Amino acid sequence: KLESIGYLYEPLSEEYRRVIDFSDMKNLRSMFNKITIHVSDKCIQVNKGYLSDFVTSLIRLSDSDINTYDSFDITYIDPRRHITWNNILSILNEK
């Protein structure tokens, strides 16, 4: 679950709302003032496709240790030339 790696995730399939980075459960509870999840023994399934790619990207980003790099080479991405980025942006900007 994204909650276990520090993200609150609201499904993209129900109109994307937000992805919020939080470092501990106290921050999340003070923000929403409610219990975050109901724990059950059922298996969680993520639909394949664009949503799965987005979640995989978030997981890879959280697994990478950004602080270990001294400097980054900035790469500019033109969504018109990269179909993957174009698809992600179309999902995020869909109303």
From Swiss-Prot:
Keywords: Host cytoplasm, Late protein, Virion
One Pfam family, short name: Pox_J1
Stated induction or repression of this protein's expression: Expressed in the late phase of the viral replicative cycle.
GO CC terms in record: host cell cytoplasm; virion component
InterPro entries hit by this protein: Poxvirus_J1
Chief location of this protein within or outside the cell: virion
Subcellular location: Virion; Host cytoplasm
Keyword flag Magnesium: no
Residues passing through the membrane, by range: none
Keyword Lipid metabolism: no
Summary of subunit composition and partner proteins: Homodimer. Part of a complex composed of A30, G7, F10 kinase, A15, D2, D3, and J1. Interacts with A45.
Purpose of the protein: Late protein which is a part of a large complex required for early virion morphogenesis. This complex participates in the formation of virosomes and the incorporation of virosomal contents into nascent immature virions. J1 protein is required for DNA packaging during immature virions (IV) formation.
UniProt family annotation: Belongs to the chordopoxvirinae J1 family.
Name of the protein in question: Protein J1 homolog
